[in-house]
């Protein structure tokens, strides 16, 4: 009986370890090599697994930045996205320009940017993820381009100054 209990405990421990390791995020050091570009921080990523980086992703912004122009390219690679929460709580940020190379605005990307008054969303963007502009207290109007087909939950939550928003008919 003791042997069965010990075996059961051992097997349970192995299963728990396997389960935990399978849900732990994996990233190689190459993927997470954060580099600076003006007020921005970025990483380069390999999307097709061929060992060559294909695009850049904005991962952070200097919290004292006032006006930011996201470049279309960094290191000759297109900037395709902003990481979740990349600009979050940049309270000095008043305006941001997003290039046509960007196709998605990450979760909480501009959340808490309380001074953000204007942003251009290019026609290349197809998705605005959850809480993207949450608590952007100075944002008064925004136009969503026809290319956007999905706006996730709370994208504009607590945008207390928002008085005008144009959303295309095809948005879900």
Whereabouts are the PLM-identified features?
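N-terminal secretory signal peptides that target proteins for export/translocation
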Residues: 1-5
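Sec-dependent N-terminal signal peptides of Gram-positive bacterial secreted proteins and lipoproteins
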Residues: 6-26
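Sec-dependent signal peptide cleavage junction
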Residues: 20-38
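Structural signature of tandem-repeat unit edges
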Residues: 41, 63-80, 91-104, 113-127, ...
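Acidic, glycine-anchored loop motifs typical of Ca2+
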Residues: 47-53
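Consensus positions within tandem repeat domains that build extended binding/scaffold surfaces
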Residues: 83-86, 106-111, 129-134, 152-157
């Amino acid at each position: 009986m003791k042997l069965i209990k010990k075996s059961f405990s051992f097997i349970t421990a192995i299963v728990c370890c396997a389960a935990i390791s399978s849900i732990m995020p994996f990233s190689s050091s190459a993927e997470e090599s954060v580099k600076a570009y003006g007020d921005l921080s970025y990483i380069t990523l390999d999307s097709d697994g061929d060992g060559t980086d294909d695009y850049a992703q904005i991962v952070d912004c200097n919290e004292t930045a006032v006006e930011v122009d996201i470049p279309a390219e960094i290191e000759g690679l297109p900037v395709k996205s902003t990481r979740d929460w990349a600009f979050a709580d940049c309270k000095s940020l008043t305006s941001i320009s997003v290039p046509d190379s960007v196709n998605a605005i990450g979760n909480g990307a501009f959340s808490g940017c309380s001074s953000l008054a204007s942003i251009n969303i290019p026609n290349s963007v197809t998705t605005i993820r959850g809480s993207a502009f949450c608590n952007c207290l100075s944002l008064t109007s925004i136009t969503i381009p026809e290319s956007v087909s999905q706006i996730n939950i709370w994208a504009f939550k607590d945008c207390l100054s928002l008085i005008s928003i144009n959303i295309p008919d095809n948005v879900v």
